[in-house]
Amino acid sequence: FLSLIPKIAGGIASLVKNL
């Protein structure tokens, strides 16, 4: 589960960066 956190956080960061 802990390994998914950076992946999700990275995905959110990418979405915010694209906005």
From Swiss-Prot:
Keywords: Amidation, Amphibian defense peptide, Antibiotic, Antimicrobial, Cytolysis, Fungicide, Hemolysis, Immunity, Innate immunity, Secreted. It is found in: Secreted. The modification Leucine amide is found at L19. One of its GO terms (biological process) is innate immune response. Expressed by the skin glands. Signal peptide: none annotated. One of its GO terms (cellular component) is extracellular region. Antimicrobial peptide with activity against Gram-negative bacterium E.coli ATCC 25922 (MIC=25 uM), Gram-positive bacterium S.epidermidis ATCC 12228 (MIC=6.25 uM) and against fungus C.albicans ATCC 24433 (MIC=50 uM). Has an anti-inflammatory effect, since it inhibits the production of the pro-inflammatory cytokine TNF-alpha. Has an activity of stimulation of insulin release, which may protect the species from being eaten by predators by causing fatal hypoglycemia. Is cytotoxic to cancer line cells. Shows moderate hemolysis on mouse erythrocytes (LC(50)=28 uM). This is Phylloseptin-1.1TR. It comes from Phyllomedusa trinitatis (Trinidad leaf frog). The lineage of its organism: Eukaryota, Metazoa, Chordata, Craniata, Vertebrata.
